[in-house]
């Protein structure tokens, strides 16, 4: 028979160890995987002709397309969007709409405002913050594993 008083007395106010809060190895690896395309997109920060420059970047460096979802805190490479013109399912692993449609997407989501108004200075740093925030969901999993180890 189990002594529940002894078992309950062994509880601590927290199960968190130092690695519980953020898995920075994962964050840095995710950012590193797209660092070069992000730095290409950095050229849009503060530009006055962002739409034309974005279209030129997409044509010359189509691999930059895969960076756009994480700028919206999305890991999936497909994003649904609706407006007065209809429903769109944008793909970011390869273009399934025109460059002009992706330009409209950037404008309507606010990403162009973020860049052209210099709200952020560096997309690599910005995405590091986004990845850190998204990793909070991983904290739930880490918490479950830590509890499992203790029980």
For every predicted segment, state its role:
Residues 1-139, 143-146:
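Nuclease-adjacent, charged terminal/linker segments that flank catalytic cores
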Residues 149-151:
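Catalytic core segments in nucleotide and nucleic-acid processing enzymes
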């Amino acid at each position: 028979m189990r002594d529940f008083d002894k078992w309950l007395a062994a509880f601590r106010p927290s199960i968190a160890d130092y690695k519980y809060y953020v898995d920075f190895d994962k964050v840095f690896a995710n950012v590193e995987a797209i660092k070069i395309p992000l730095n290409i997109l950095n050229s849009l920060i503060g530009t006055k002709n962002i739409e034309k420059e974005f279209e030129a970047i997409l044509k010359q460096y189509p691999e930059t397309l895969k960076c756009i979802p994480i700028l919206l805190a999305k890991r999936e490479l497909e994003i649904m969007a609706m407006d007065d013109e209809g429903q769109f399912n944008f793909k970011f692993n390869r273009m399934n709409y025109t460059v002009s449609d992706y330009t409209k997407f950037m404008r309507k989501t606010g990403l162009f405002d973020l860049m052209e108004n210099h709200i952020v200075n560096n997309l690599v740093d910005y995405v590091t913050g986004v990845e850190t925030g998204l990793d909070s969901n991983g904290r739930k999993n880490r918490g479950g594993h830590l509890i499992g180890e203790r029980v």
